[in-house]
Curated annotation (Swiss-Prot):
GO terms for molecular function: protein homodimerization activity. It is found in: Golgi apparatus, trans-Golgi network membrane. This is Protein YIP4a. The gene is YIP4A. The keyword Membrane applies.
Length: 281
């Protein structure tokens, strides 16, 4: 491109170029020893005051108590120790056997402790059945802890008393008395169950055996006093006593409309035992 083809610059651009050239020429003429003036320092900025005291703090105060790192880091919870259990005696073991729960272990106890426990149970059941008490109308409470040792003892004792009272054939008298009482108790229990009675089989045997206690007392008195009139009076009293002891338990076990069917055989068996006491001489 030739010089004739150049495009002229805008007046403002030409003035800027001229100003730049003038500044360059002035810097060259002034020489290298000239130092330009330094930029003035900027004004200091205001600083935020920081105080260590809590009263001049710009933040809002909290009502929460300060945390202690030592107590929060090592927090120990104290668990209360339960009191020791009281000592259990032998008498409490016997009471626990008749309540709900597992019975106490009696395999390692002395023989004398077992005998004492059985004797105390026999005496307790005898009081509940024969003698007046508030539980006579409730057979479930009266014979809850039933046993067969007491009835077995009263049956054997009555048979021995009758055999001692007999002058001849003592062994036959004992066999007849024992068979009559044992078979009679089983038959009477089956009779109550067939009538729809709500009673346990062995509980009924225990009840009928304990009700023989008055007849045992009457047999001992008749053995000591050989008098027919005295025998009749004693047997009548003891027969009524035994029937009175068995009445509430047997009557409450069956339907009220079948009460006579359950009580009549019981009364008949006790009457048979009474005739044996009077007849044996």
């Amino acid at each position: 491109m030739s010089q004739g083809d150049t495009v002229p610059l805008h007046p403002s651009s030409q003035s800027d170029i001229d100003e730049i050239e003038n500044l360059i020429n002035e810097s060259v003429q002034s020489g290298p020893g000239t130092v330009l003036a330094a930029r003035p320092p900027s004004p200091t900025r205001p600083s935020i005051p920081v105080s260590s005291s809590s009263s001049s703090s710009p933040f809002m105060q909290s009502n929460l108590p300060p945390l202690h790192p030592s107590s929060s880091a090592q927090k120990v919870t104290h668990v209360p120790v339960p009191p020791p259990l009281p000592a259990v005696s032998n008498s409490s073991n016997f009471q626990g056997a008749s309540a709900f729960g597992s019975p106490p272990n009696t395999l390692t106890e002395p023989v004398w402790d077992t005998v004492k426990r059985d004797l105390s149970r026999i005496v307790s059941n005898l009081k509940l059945v024969v003698f007046p008490n508030p539980y006579r109308e409730d057979p479930g409470k009266a014979l809850r802890d039933w046993d067969l040792w007491g009835p077995f003892f009263f049956i054997v004792f009555l048979g021995l008393t009758l055999s001692w009272s007999a002058s001849v054939k003592k062994s036959e008298v004992f066999a007849v008395a024992f068979a009559l009482l044992a078979a009679g108790a089983v038959i009477l229990t089956l009779n109550v169950l067939l009538l729809g009675g709500h009673i346990i089989f062995f509980q009924s045997l225990s009840l009928l055996g304990y009700c023989l206690f008055p007849l045992d007392v009457g047999a001992v008195i008749c053995m000591l006093k050989d008098n027919v009139i005295l025998k009749m009076v004693v047997v009548s009293v003891t027969l009524a006593w035994s029937s009175w002891a068995a009445y509430p338990f047997m009557s409450s076990a069956v339907n009220p409309r079948r009460k006579a069917l359950a009580l009549y055989p019981v009364f008949l068996m006790y009457v048979s035992v009474g005739f044996l006491i009077i007849a044996i001489n």
